[in-house]
Amino acid sequence: MSHARDDHQGASQGSQWLSQARTLVQEGTLFNFIRCLLLFQGDSGQKEMTPGKKIPIFVDGVVLNGPQTDVKAGEKFVEEACRLIMEEVVLKATDVNEKVCEWQPPEQLRQLLDLEMRDTGESQDKLLKLCQDVIHFSVKTNHPRFFNQLYAGLDYYSLAARIITEALNPSIYTYEVSPVFLLVEEAVLKKMIECVGWKEGDGIFNPGGSVSNMCAMNLARYRHCPDIKEKGLSGLPRLILFTSAECHYSMKKAASFLGIGTQNVYFVETDGRGKMIPEDLEKQIWQARQEGAVPFLVCATSGTTVLGAFDPLDEIAEVCERHGLWLHVDASWGGSALVSRKHRRLLHGIHRADSVAWNPHKMLMAGIQCSALLVKDKSDLLKKCYSAKATYLFQQDKFYDVSYDTGDKSIQCSRRPDAFKFWMTWKALGTSGLEERVNRAFALSRYLVDEIKKREGFKLLMEPEYTNVCFWYIPPSLREMEEGPEFWRKLSLVAPAIKEKMMKKGSLMLGYQPHRGKVNFFRQVVISPQVSREDMDFLLDEIDSLGRDM
């Protein structure tokens, strides 16, 4: 009986297969029909399927048997791509003989790169060539002479962590899908909170300091008027926030995005070093109240973008406490000084803040992006402000402690495990190693300042407080000229012209900007431990070489 049943089942399956095959031929899908034949692996006289083989299943003309991806080819491609990364990125990261960039204008770069997406895929050899081109024409931010931004250098431990997370492709909103990375984030946040000086607190990692600042602004507003979450802006009084005239531009963006309005961002005057003046802050708070507006937030800055200035947090906290205002500290750039016993004094009083933004991807080289928003509150204010209680993610009847499902503390759903990069570096170096990294950056900046003072044609903007060294290069043609309007007009042209030359040569990258009435000057920032005294000397020598004939 069993043999008869098997024969009947085989005949039925064969009949089903023939019916599907006829349909494919009638529809003209010859390719799928051939695949069907190959998968069936039988002949017209075969009554039973080959042991271990399954007849092909079709849905809408698509064969569903087996994986579509060529696994072996994929593994080979990843292996070759990783070899390319090691040879062209990692091994060359500290080689000063390599160019920082291979500058090409957009029109020419488009011609050099094959950017078009086609109907058919490219060969693996072509893809590897594209990878090589991408590396070749990209700016080498790992290079010891890349000084253009507030990030630089290569941290090998962070890089390894990034490779792991890219391969695992996790998203951290619930413990069930990302158990390790949620516990890692919890551990890192706890340690960062200790660095700030709080006994306890809360926090979340965000995609950059701008988002952390915006989330802090929204959190402060929610604390002030919690009904806004459900009722929106209607019926709210005119809300005012105060920040330094030297603040990061993300403050204006956040006010615009949140519906507060950029006109309701009051910019507090700064002193000659770029620090917020607490007396002007208090004056503006009273002025806002006289206008019938409602102050709710003060945003101080620890480490301004251009000058590297640190606002006087203790004095600002006194003002905030008198007026009942939330104090947020944007320490995206300067927060890393907290790990240095010698330099953490720059952030004295930060423990009095209600929230802090801190980017380990800057001086601590955790890799972009790695930004934490730290909050002193422990009443679940983050979750109350941002939760949407999506029932498909945050079920309350799970078999584990759902307090580990932290996704409702964030404005995001999918969220990268950015804390893991910083955790790996911290585990590798220890707090003392991070401290040494910060102290070395300060020492190299001090060396550069001393060299600038010694050299003819270089002029400091001011003595730096952090590792931002701002200076002018004055070419020989201007050195005997009186410092009047014409002198400053001509000097304003020098930094952009030298920047163009260094970019086209590929020798180094250095930022410049005008700032609050001062004409274009260079801003040199030391971050990477791969940077040496010789690189500081080269920086000044190269600027002099490129600008001497101007």
UniProtKB/Swiss-Prot annotation:
One of its GO terms (biological process) is carboxylic acid metabolic process. Pfam families: Pyridoxal_deC (PF00282). PROSITE patterns: DDC_GAD_HDC_YDC. The modification N6-(pyridoxal phosphate)lysine is found at K362. Keywords: Decarboxylase, Lyase, Pyridoxal phosphate. It catalyses: L-aspartate + H(+) = beta-alanine + CO2; 3-sulfino-L-alanine + H(+) = hypotaurine + CO2; L-cysteate + H(+) = taurine + CO2. The keyword Lyase applies. Activated weakly by 0.2-0.4 mM Li(+). Inhibited by bis-carboxymethyl-trithiocarbonate, ethylxanthogenacetic acid and 2,5-disulfoaniline. Expressed in skeletal muscles and kidney (at protein level). Expressed in skeletal muscle and weakly in brain. Not expressed in liver or kidney. Expressed in brain, olfactory bulb, liver, muscle and kidney with the highest expression in olfactory bulb and almost not detected in liver (at protein level). Gene3D superfamilies: 3.90.1150.170, Type I PLP-dependent aspartate aminotransferase-like (Major domain) (3.40.640.10). CDD domains: DOPA_deC_like. Its EC number is 4.1.1.11, 4.1.1.29. One of its GO terms (molecular function) is pyridoxal phosphate binding. Its cofactor is pyridoxal 5'-phosphate. It is an enzyme of class 4 (lyase). The keyword Chaperone does not apply. Homodimer. PANTHER family: ACIDIC AMINO ACID DECARBOXYLASE GADL1, GLUTAMATE DECARBOXYLASE-RELATED. Belongs to the group II decarboxylase family. Catalyzes the decarboxylation of L-aspartate, 3-sulfino-L-alanine (cysteine sulfinic acid), and L-cysteate to beta-alanine, hypotaurine and taurine, respectively. The preferred substrate is L-aspartate. Does not exhibit any decarboxylation activity toward glutamate. This is Acidic amino acid decarboxylase GADL1. It comes from Mus musculus (Mouse).
